[in-house]
Amino acid sequence: MIKKRVIPCLDVKDGRVVKGIQFQSLRDIGNPVDLALYYNEAGADELVFLDISKTEAGHDLMIEVIEATAKQLFIPLTVGGGIQNLDDITQLLNHGADKISLNSSALKHPELIRQASEKFGRQCICIAIDSFYDKDREDYFCTTHGGKKLTDVSVYDWVQEVEHLGAGELLITSMHHDGMKQGFDIEHLAKIKQLVNIPIIASGGGGNAQHFVELFQQTDVSAGLAASILHDQETTVAEIKDKMREGGILVR
């Protein structure tokens, strides 16, 4: 049985870690390098850096932050946000990223997934999906540009397409759960898992350690992402893992 992962997520804007609720009302959390090293020591299985400054305003890729972090990190580092082409991916991997997360650029140019997978290996390519539930259409649709632009692309169709194109992993953020701390979107995640064979990282809604237990007991996703509850020290990676063990879930 595969051990489940707990992954802190650091949203970085203009060189600082920020966090909001449902992608809005961002507040400053701290220095990304310091926080990354803290989570490395605290037992995190991986780290995700999402450069939302790049997504919003076209800021340069945060190479210096990634390089400084990777030099001292002993766990895998995934980097996403504003990655447009193979050159961007090459630069990030060369400066310390272990995996790359593609979102808007993959929706705009799906062939980028295949090209990146063939060049770097599918294990390096994670497709991030900011999933929005449209009440009128009663279905989930992909968004782009940091959740600001709604598309007509069905999440359930897109996850199957990206797996076919060569994605090695999915990062699914349920936007209406993001920052709400009321639990993961279990039904949505379970349905996605039925459609694909690649690992899924669940994001959006983890408000306490028990929510991670419920996530792994009720779905077959591979990992749970956490941000505000860790940044605000409402719980720790160790406490989440202890609760998971109590629930009979294998952890690293």
UniProtKB/Swiss-Prot annotation:
UniProt similarity note: Belongs to the HisA/HisF family.
Top-level lineage group: Bacteria
Function: IGPS catalyzes the conversion of PRFAR and glutamine to IGP, AICAR and glutamate. The HisF subunit catalyzes the cyclization activity that produces IGP and AICAR from PRFAR using the ammonia provided by the HisH subunit.
Subcellular location: Cytoplasm
Gene Ontology MF terms in the entry: imidazoleglycerol-phosphate synthase activity; lyase activity
EC numbers for this chain: 4.3.2.10
Name of this protein: Imidazole glycerol phosphate synthase subunit HisF
Membrane-traversing stretches: none
GO cellular component: cytoplasm
Assembly with partners or alone: Heterodimer of HisH and HisF.
